[in-house]
Amino acid sequence: MLFEQIAANKRKTVFIVIGFFIFVLMVGAAIGIIVWNNYLNGLILAAVIGAFYILIMVMTSSSVVMAMNRAKRITSKEQAPVLWDTVESMAMVASIPMPKVYIMNDLSLNAFSAGISPEKGAVAVTQGLLDNLERYELEGVIAHEVSHIRNYDIRLSTISIALVAVIAILSDLAMRMIFWGSVTGSRNNRKNDNNSGGGAQLIIYIVALVFVVLAPIIATAIQFALSRNREYLADASAIELTRNPDGLIQALQKVSGDTKKMKEVSASSESIYFSSPLKSKKDKPGIFDSHPPISSRIERLENM
């Protein structure tokens, strides 16, 4: 059951990622139709901006995320022996280099991981998590975060965030070009096409325009669907490492019952946390939720 769930989550992720890239290209094509009356120009624009933005995000993600979330690095075992030992042992079981260790001075119960590869991995936990979890519960949380690193989820999350940003940039660019009359020439060409093609070209233009306007919303929903799926995968992978579902289950129960809100958290980092630091812990999932409901995560773990 455990390995079947891991395999199913990986397959679902592949489909979502492929669909995400196709969606970005569709947005580019729609913009090409709107701005230049030529979908190929839009495809090229989307590919160039997308590649550049993803490269920048991947190169700077880890250090930026830690700074944005006020995480302070622990450089020796003596500073936090239990945390250090737990991260070290889980990394050893996962067969990855030991991630850098960080602590956030916050009383809420949460954690996150960063790093685009296992060699550049980092794990951060709140002081509240350290103070309130038993050792075996902490192992469950750390195993979850180490699984994110081992499964390259941070790289995937970084790319998905970059793609959402690219789509927002492309959509905004198209709207500005239309507003400032930069597409006058293409409008004239489109008008001539409408005269010869009956109104088909106008219909295509309107559909493309509506698609571009809605694209950022759809892209955000896709990004969060990917994030929710990777949370389920990290939970299952954590059990593979610890062989003790009770630790993670009880950690999730404590996190679910935690009423303290994080004092300082970056909204752009929401999806990488163990539990959403921004939204209430509800039982019903929403398409704009970065995490599945904790009750759903616990149910899946209990059924393994």
UniProtKB/Swiss-Prot annotation:
Alphabetized UniProt keyword annotations: Cell membrane, Hydrolase, Membrane, Metal-binding, Metalloprotease, Protease, Transmembrane, Transmembrane helix, Zinc
Gene3D superfamilies cross-referenced by the UniProt entry: Metalloproteases ('zincins'), catalytic domain
Details of cofactor binding: Binds 1 zinc ion per subunit.
InterPro entries the UniProt entry points to: HtpX_protease (IPR050083), Pept_M48_protease_HtpX (IPR022919), Peptidase_M48 (IPR001915)
Source domain of life: Bacteria
Residues that span the membrane, as ranges: 14-34, 39-59, 161-181, 202-222
Residues bound to Zn(2+): 144, 148, 231
Cofactors, names only: Zn(2+)
Record's bilayer topology term: Multi-pass membrane protein
GO molecular function: metalloendopeptidase activity; zinc ion binding
Protein name (Swiss-Prot/TrEMBL): Protease HtpX homolog
